[in-house]
């Protein structure tokens, strides 16, 4: 079996703020071609880690290695990374072509090569023919696709995405997730993604890092995180969960795993809520003093 190549390694990395907040004892290996998502509530430290990888924040302690080489002393523009933020950061007075070409021109890439690379990249993100348009003529999803394309044109070793779809509506977010998966698969690039949206993390990721209060609660595949949560925080943060306290322990049961025993015949219950969720309906019913969701 071929050994996987480590693309990014965080070694006992820490970033502390003056007020004591931040992250510490961060250790993680990310392998080539993976999409790894940092998932957690606001303020848990996920964006802090991403910004230290990109060089937009200095580490307090520890090391960050890309392809085995330390990058902690390199400024952002010298790092083999490209970062896409929630805001698109496209220049409104430039055409899409000019926005895409800007970084390549700074690197003194010949115009003929720039034209060929932009043509190929626009085909990859399904936006051929948009070269002469301006950002204001594009939808939010299209602008984010161009922002991602601009980053990919620089051929980074790591693509860093800081909640890039959070400003988009639900349907466009889903389309963008599918588009990102396709692009990542076609290019084989390593992606570090940050989100507070559990559905987004589950849909996109090869592995998920669930964070809480500046630390890792669990690192695993979406299936491992969902089926075998390591802590109560992970269990409550991922999917729906019923918690049943039993003495000094807590039993966690997902609603879809509950089976009603019909052995005692029909039971009367009061329907408390009905939620239509596309192809299925969630009912909350009250039976005596027991609440059951199914």
Segment roles from a protein language model:
Residues 250-294:
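Non-catalytic connector elements of ABC transporters
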Residues 62-70:
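Conserved ABC transporter NBD signature motif
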Residues 35, 76-230:
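ABC ATPase nucleotide-binding domains
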Residues 54:
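Helix-to-loop junction immediately C-terminal to a conserved catalytic motif
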Residues 39-41:
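The feature captures the beta-strand-to-loop junction immediately N-terminal to the Walker
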Residues 47-50, 146:
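ABC ATPase nucleotide-binding domain helices that frame the ATP-binding cleft
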């Amino acid at each position: 079996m071929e050994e996987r190549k480590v693309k990014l390694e965080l070694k006992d990395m820490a970033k502390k703020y003056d007020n004591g907040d931040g992250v510490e004892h961060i250790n993680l290996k990310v392998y080539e071609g993976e999409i790894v998502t940092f998932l957690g509530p606001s303020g848990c430290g996920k964006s802090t880690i991403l910004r230290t990888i990109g060089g937009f924040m200095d580490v307090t302690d520890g090391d960050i290695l890309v392809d085995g080489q330390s990058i902690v002393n390199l400024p952002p523009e010298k790092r083999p990374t490209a970062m896409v933020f929630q805001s698109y950061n496209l220049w409104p007075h430039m055409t899409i072509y000019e926005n895409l070409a800007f970084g390549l021109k700074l690197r003194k890439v010949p115009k003929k090569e720039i034209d060929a690379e932009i043509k190929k990249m626009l085909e990859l993100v399904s936006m051929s023919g948009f070269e002469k348009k301006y950002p204001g003529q594009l939808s939010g999803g299209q602008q984010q696709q161009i922002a991602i394309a601009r980053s990919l044109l620089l051929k980074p070793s790591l693509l860093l995405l800081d909640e890039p779809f959070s400003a988009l509506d639900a349907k466009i977010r889903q389309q963008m997730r599918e588009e990102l998966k396709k692009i990542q698969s076609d290019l084989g690039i390593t992606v570090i993604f940050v989100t507070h949206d559990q559905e987004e993390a589950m849909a996109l990721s090869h592995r998920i890092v669930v964070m809480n209060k500046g630390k890792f609660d669990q690192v695993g595949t979406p299936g491992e995180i969902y089926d075998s949560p390591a802590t109560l925080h992970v269990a409550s943060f991922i999917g729906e969960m019923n918690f049943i306290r039993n003495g000094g322990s807590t039993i966690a049961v997902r609603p879809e795993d509950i089976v009603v025993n019909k052995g005692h015949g029909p039971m009367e219950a009061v329907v408390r809520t009905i939620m239509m969720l596309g192809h299925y309906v969630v009912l909350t019913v009250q039976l005596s003093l027991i609440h059951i969701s199914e």
